Amino acid sequence: MPYRLVKQVRGNEVLRKSFMELAMKTFSLNFRRWCEDGYWTERYIPYVLADGDRVIANVSVNRMDMLWRGQAKQYIQIGTVMTDEAYRGKGLSKFLIETVLHDWKDRCDAIYLFANRTVLDFYPKFGFVKAVEHQQSFSLAPQPGDFQKLDMQNERHRQLLLDCYHLAN
C-alpha cells in the first residue's frame, strides 16, 4: 500500500489538523474545541492512512472502561470511519478496520461500533452483527433547586465536572 499508516495523530500537529479537516468535510464533526479543551486523551486513537501530510482515511479506536454485571471490562468502540472522497473504492477503510481488529482482538473484552443505514452491509464482512438498540425516554417536570448549568468553556466548570467524574469512577 503506497500510503503511510499512523496509529495516533494527537501529537502530530500536521496530521492532527488534516484528520480534523477530513472529519469536518465528511461528517461536519469539529474536533478542534474537544482537542483544545484537553478531552482528546491517549484513549482516543485514530488509525489514519496518510498520503504525504494529508489524512485520506481513518478508523478511530476509543478505549472505554465499563462495568458489566459487576465485572470491569475494557471495550473498544470503533468510530469516525471515513475516507476522503478522492480515495474511496480502494479498500482503505477495509485495511484500517482489519488493522484495528488485529491490534485489539486480544487486548480487550469486546469491540463494537454504531453504524448508520448506509453502511449496514459493510461491517458484517468483519464479523460484526446487528444488535437491537433500545431507547427509553420519559418526561421530567422542572424541579426547583440551586442547580447551575456548567459552561465547558470555563476552566473551573470543566475541572468540577472532571472531579465529579473521578469520584464516581
Language-model segments: which ranges?
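A conserved beta-strand-loop-helix scaffold within acyl/acetyltransferase catalytic domains
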Residues: 3-81, 169
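Short alpha-helical
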Residues: 14, 118-121
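An acidic- and aromatic-residue-enriched active-site/binding cleft used to recognize and process polar
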Residues: 64, 116-119
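Conserved acetyl-CoA-binding loop-helix of GNAT-fold acetyltransferases
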Residues: 83, 89-102
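Conserved GNAT acetyl-CoA-binding A-motif
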Residues: 102-116
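Conserved active-site tyrosine of GNAT-family acetyltransferases
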Residues: 123-124, 128
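Amide-forming acyltransferase catalytic core, primarily the GNAT-like/NAT-type
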Residues: 129-169
